[in-house]
């Protein structure tokens, strides 16, 4: 097929694709996914601590904060937190209670925490 038939529609699609999304806004909902792997001998205590962290998050402005245990690996958890904006998440991260719980969790880990942040897209 000659280029004259597909070049103009392709160009139009490219313009639409690159102009559809503006820069990320600070007031959009943010999420954090944290993968936590405890030492097998410490998984019960670790589970208590991640549940405390999730409860603390819910009390301090999280839209949602869950701690989910992997079925096949009972020492592996995925924490999912949703915040109204980046400032709310950063405020929670800087709380002394949050820092204390994270320090206690870190002492029980098999591997470092794997934190992934992002912006929710509607």
Name each model feature, range by range.
Residues 37-48:
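Short, surface-exposed ligand-recognition loops at beta-strand->loop->(often short) alpha-helix junctions
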Residues 1-11:
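Bacterial N-terminal signal peptides that target proteins for export
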Residues 5-6, 17-31, 36, 63-73, ...:
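Glycine-rich beta-strand-turn "strand-cap" elements at beta-sheet edges
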């Amino acid at each position: 097929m000659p280029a004259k038939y597909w070049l103009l529609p392709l160009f139009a699609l490219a313009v639409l694709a690159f102009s559809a999304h503006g820069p990320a806004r600070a007031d959009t909902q943010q999420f954090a996914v944290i993968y936590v792997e405890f030492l097998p001998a410490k998984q019960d205590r670790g589970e208590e601590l991640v549940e405390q962290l999730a409860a603390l998050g819910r009390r301090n402005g999280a839209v949602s904060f869950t701690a989910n245990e992997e079925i096949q690996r009972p020492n592996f958890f995925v924490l999912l937190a949703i915040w109204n904006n980046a400032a709310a998440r950063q405020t929670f991260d800087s709380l002394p209670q949050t820092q204390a719980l994270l320090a206690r969790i870190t002492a029980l880990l098999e591997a470092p925490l794997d934190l992934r942040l992002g912006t929710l897209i509607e």
